[in-house]
Amino acid sequence: TRWRDQDMDWAIAVNRKQGVYADPERKSELTALNQHARALTEAWNEGLSKALPLTVYYDVNRAVLDVPMRVREKLADSPDEAYLDALDPGGADFKRFFIWFRNLEDQENEFRRDDPLHRKPELEAVREAIASLTGFSELRVRRNPLRMTLSKAGQELNVQQLSDGERTLLALVGDMARRLSMLNRVPSKRQGPGVVLIDEIDLHLHPRWQRDVVAKLENTFPQCQFILSTHSPQVLGELPPEAVKVLGDGQLRPAPGRTLGLSSSEVLEEIMEGPSRNTAVAQALHTLEHAMEDGDYPQARRHLAALRSQVGDIPEVLRLEEQLAWLDPAMEDEA
């Protein structure tokens, strides 16, 4: 591990207690890591450190099922809270984000009675991050009835009215900004360093959002490194090949020669090795082209009519119809 130009060697080994296959040569070596962790903690406690690194993992179970507005809980404002459950399986605890936001907004509203322009930097970091990634604004808690709302395209909505993809991304971004705000003493809380792992970044997202979600994450949290998994051609088509690792059967496959700028169908065929078109339709198109190449134009016309009745005027059908009309004068006579 390398942190602030310092190399650290460490390892964690887990042997079954009194296990038959316990390996005495395998043991944890955490001395260097523990020493560095203590140094970071001391620097933070003494006010010498302005930022601590975030490490957090969001798995595929991060879907937000409910917004627990009526839960009352006092949360600590410390680095310990920022790291709580950050690497646990089962998804980040988004409940804590909503509770944290409501508690801080209560404090902000108290100060605004005397100073209407007062804003909590921690909440501003969340609002800025959400606006940057989703375009939503004015995230707030309404009291009567109790609900969390935001502005989408100028319309105030309850967050429960958002799609699953919108709500999941909102909570993920809010949780990241919350954690970073507790680990940074700089004015711009979103500028903190970190390593963020997100499984299936395209989870529930509309294909249009999949296209730019990675770029928006990098712009919103510029000092964070993102390690993402995806099965989305839209996501892969927005990344340079050096940023892509292809896994198959638990093995690292050869790096792709190109990804950025490819269409979704090209990504499916070249990177994912899958068909970009329905197999039956692809076979019908091949049969039509084969008849045209053989000069069997009557048969080609029958294939064309059958295919059109099945799929309509898709671009490939129109292209082959135009070619057939040029090759077979009989089509123009019939027209």
What residues fall within each predicted segment?
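P-loop NTPase switch/coupling surface
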Residues: 1-95, 287, 292, 312-335
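Extended helical coiled-coil dimerization/tether regions that scaffold
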Residues: 3, 79-169, 174-191
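Soluble or luminal CAZymes and related metallo-dependent hydrolases
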Residues: 32-36, 118-125, 168, 209, ...
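RecA-like P-loop NTPase motor core
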Residues: 45, 215, 219-221, 234-335
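Non-catalytic, well-ordered alpha-helical scaffold segments
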Residues: 52-55, 81, 124, 167-170, ...
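Short, polar/flexible loop-turn hinges at active-site or ligand-entry regions and domain interfaces
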Residues: 65, 70-72, 111-112, 274-277
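Short coil/turn segments at secondary-structure boundaries
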Residues: 70, 142-144, 280-284
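Switch/communication elements of ASCE P-loop NTPase nucleotide-binding domains
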Residues: 143, 147-276
